[in-house]
């Protein structure tokens, strides 16, 4: 799916972010990921100074694509011992030679995506660039990308279980970028966009979110929850 125009979907990102509530059962996982990003803040800041990309944007990409730790290609999580094998394939090109340093890879990844040319960042643009990194294919299925929203109320079910293979009932088991980012903002109050706080005010009950059409995945999720509750009740009686 081709990339949508940012200006046409930025408002929807703002609404999703403002209405996002992290699932209590997954809050600890999001906090752990955020602390892992903060553990390497100095490395992200060093690359930020050379690229003008905010350190927390670099950290988020590293966590989502490579599991954090500044130890794999920022492009896609491939090993730094050789050029990238997965898309984008063949990075870094000659005259650079492997093994590569993490800063080398990070600066190349940010440059080929044009992130070093961005003049003004916002939480909406962060959402857009993170979704672009993973792909906009979820939009064709009418759901919010789990890459962004998993572990929050903005995602329920549906995912690609392998390249091009879609399942309406599969549920992502990975924390989404935005729940992690919310934890990161809570732990590091210096994070802001052009001096404005990154985190929204606490949403009121029934905060407006993207319309969510009931899917088979939703029904399966609800049935599983009911079965789980019944089993617990049966064991207790």
Please give the residue ranges for each predicted region.
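Non-catalytic cell-wall polysaccharide-engagement segments
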Residues: 1-18, 92-237
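N-terminal export signals and maturation junctions of secreted/periplasmic proteins
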Residues: 1-46
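Second-shell loop/turn segments in exported
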Residues: 26-35, 43-50, 88-99, 167-170
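Alpha-helix initiation and capping sites
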Residues: 38, 55, 99-103
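Short, well-ordered alpha-helical packing segments
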Residues: 41-48, 62, 103-113
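Short, functionally critical alpha-helical segments immediately adjacent to catalytic or ligand/cofactor-binding
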Residues: 52-69, 109-110
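Substrate-binding/active-site groove segments that recognize
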Residues: 71-93
């Amino acid at each position: 799916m081709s990339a949508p125009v940012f200006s046409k979907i930025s408002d929807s990102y703002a609404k999703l972010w403002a209405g996002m509530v992290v699932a209590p059962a997954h809050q600890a996982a999001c906090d752990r990921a955020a602390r892992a990003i903060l553990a390497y803040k100095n490395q992200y800041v060093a690359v930020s100074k050379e690229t003008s990309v905010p350190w927390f944007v670099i950290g988020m990409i590293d966590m989502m694509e490579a599991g954090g730790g500044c130890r794999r290609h920022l492009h896609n999580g491939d090993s730094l011992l050789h050029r990238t094998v997965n898309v984008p394939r063949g990075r870094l090109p000659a005259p650079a030679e492997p093994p590569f340093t993490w800063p080398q890879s990070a600066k190349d990844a940010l440059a080929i995506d044009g992130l070093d040319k961005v003049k003004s960042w916002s939480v909406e643009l962060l959402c857009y660039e993170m979704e672009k990194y993973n792909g906009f294919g979820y939009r064709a299925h009418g759901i919010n990308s789990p890459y962004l929203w998993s572990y929050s109320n903005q995602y329920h079910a549906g995912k690609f279980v392998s390249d091009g293979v879609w399942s309406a009932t599969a549920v992502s088991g990975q924390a989404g970028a935005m729940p992690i980012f919310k934890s990161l903002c809570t732990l590091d109050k210096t994070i802001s966009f052009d001096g404005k706080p990154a985190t929204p005010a606490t949403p009121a009950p029934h905060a407006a979110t993207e319309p969510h059409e009931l899917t088979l995945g939703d029904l399966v999720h609800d049935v599983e929850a009911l079965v789980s509750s019944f089993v617990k009740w049966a064991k207790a009686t």
